[in-house]
Amino acid sequence: MERAIFAGGCFWCMVQPFEEQAGILSVRSGYTGGHVPNPSYEQVCSKTTGHTEAVEIIFDPSLISYSDLVELYWAQTDPTDAFGQFEDRGDNYRPVIYYTDERQREIAERSKQSLQASGRFDQPIVTSIEPAEPFYLAEDYHQGFYQKNPQRYAQSSAIRHQFLEEHWQ
């Protein structure tokens, strides 16, 4: 099994696309990239801990590759917005691909270069590619949020889904 960590704005919206893929064993919402051990949601939202909301994905590389996950990641984000994603603003919502080893870093860098060269976006691809740091699991009420709160999830993800349809479909 392997691990991937992606930050793409609100973690509620990043779970379902990955959970639907064959070879995914788990997708958990959490916080990473900051300087406070085991932060709470309230601390992360205060924008004082340095953390981003992210998802940790455990996957079977014999069924789905890390490269496939990176491609799916791009299609869930606006890679031209470094200051948050959609209606969620600030460093805690910035887009980041966190790599766990050199191979993941190389795959992510090549994929980013390929996306930039594709001309899909008029602006530069600004998603960061950074080494993985400790991943702290978010509170239980954040786990599987789209399943527990479908109406609130639909409302909170509407702007994202509109962008994705316009730019990735």
From Swiss-Prot:
It is an enzyme of class 1 (oxidoreductase). The active site is at residue 10. GO terms for biological process: protein modification process. It comes from the Bacteria. Gene3D superfamilies: Peptide methionine sulphoxide reductase MsrA (3.30.1060.10). One of its GO terms (molecular function) is peptide-methionine (S)-S-oxide reductase activity. The keyword Translocase does not apply. It catalyses: L-methionyl-[protein] + [thioredoxin]-disulfide + H2O = L-methionyl-(S)-S-oxide-[protein] + [thioredoxin]-dithiol; [thioredoxin]-disulfide + L-methionine + H2O = L-methionine (S)-S-oxide + [thioredoxin]-dithiol. InterPro entries: Met_Sox_Rdtase_MsrA_dom, Met_Sox_Rdtase_MsrA_sf. Keywords: Oxidoreductase. Its EC number is 1.8.4.11. The keyword Oxidoreductase applies. HAMAP family: MsrA. Belongs to the MsrA Met sulfoxide reductase family. Has an important function as a repair enzyme for proteins that have been inactivated by oxidation. Catalyzes the reversible oxidation-reduction of methionine sulfoxide in proteins to methionine. This is Peptide methionine sulfoxide reductase MsrA.
